[in-house]
Amino acid sequence: MIAHQRLIASDGYEVCLFPLSYLYMSQDEGGDYSHAGTLCIDFLGWGANGRVYNCDYYAPCTCKLVNSTLDPASNMRVWESVAPVHLPDGTLDYICFQFGHDNNPPYSTVGTVVTQGELIGHTGTAGYVTGDHLHYNVARGNYAGGERVPPNNNFQLKNSIHIYDANYVNDTVIVRGFNHNWRTYGGPTPPPPVPPTPFGKGDFVVMFNNISRTKRKEVNLWRA
């Protein structure tokens, strides 16, 4: 999504959008590192000219701050939608977001409400990190706290879901999406899931969404 963007379906409910203008994954969910057993993903700040540090990201939907003390060292913030929102898995539900590593979070007071598309944070290096990024986790429903999961006792929100099932990527440029099933919203009814294109190893994909948000064009950006 882009700054100040709002997307409201014909039924009056917001469409949940991906919080960054460029999608560049640096660590996937699961695996054998700090995300083992979780559905958390790390994203780099990115722009038309490459890496962006302290990169702005925006409220995926209108949401309220429900926890600002989950991990003080990493400045974790948990937000909950103020109403049900449309999700790429075809459901309408409440949703919670955990954002981490912002060195200067703009909000700390529980109960603060931020409108969809407004600034909600920045990529950063707060806490135990190896570089500037956004640590992102999404959970379905109202905020229910967190949990430690095997095999490494890593933390995630309870009722976590895949980020690509929670955020549409309208007006987001996909630079490195690990071939996950990222989808755009064409409203008023969320489209069915589309199988990911089988790109070869080393292929990066860029997805351009036009202003109507109903069409998309995928091209190979470059082949390693």
What are these regions (language model features)?
Residues 2-16, 47, 51-52, 109-115, ...:
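Acidic, glycine-rich catalytic/binding loops that coordinate metals and/or anionic ligands
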Residues 9-25, 34, 67-72, 116, ...:
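Polar, enzyme-active/binding microenvironments
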Residues 20-61:
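Short glycine/threonine/proline-enriched tight-turn/helix- or strand-capping micro-motif at secondary-structure
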Residues 25, 63, 111-123:
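A structural signal for short beta-strand/turn segments enriched in small hydrophobics and glycine
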Residues 26, 44, 80, 100, ...:
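Residue-level detector of conserved, well-ordered beta-strand and adjacent loop positions
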Residues 40-43, 116, 121-122, 133-139:
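Active-site scaffold segments
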Residues 52-54, 58-107, 126-140:
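Zn2+-dependent peptidoglycan hydrolase active-site motif and core
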Residues 220-224:
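Short, surface-exposed polybasic-aromatic patches that bind anionic ligands, especially phosphate groups
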